[in-house]
Amino acid sequence: MVRKLYILLFILFLNFTVQAQTQTGKASYYSKKWTGRRTASGERIHHDSMTCAHRKYPFGTLLRVTNKKNGLQAIVRVNDRGPFDRGRIVDLSWGAAKAIGMLVAGVVPVTVERVDSVSSR
């Protein structure tokens, strides 16, 4: 019983540690053709929304995504799981991709960090 408690505490510790870190990697985005499909959270994809897919963060978490090539930022809400391509850390909605200026490139280097509220800077 004590062993199970230690394992649970260790898993919780790792989960909170990962969520507090800034991540660097590549972002891609959902094209408009995905509009209307359901995400892992059950929401429908809206191309103009400010949402994203992330492997670890809980649904509803707000993230600041910064395009490292041009410095543009967007605050997005996690509502899906992914990306499933190696080397990518976040999939953005079309609207979020437009906000950070990545529509032409398709895949760009980004930093991702958790924010407490939309007014966080």
Residue positions per predicted region:
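Secreted/periplasmic proteins
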Residues: 2-5, 18-121
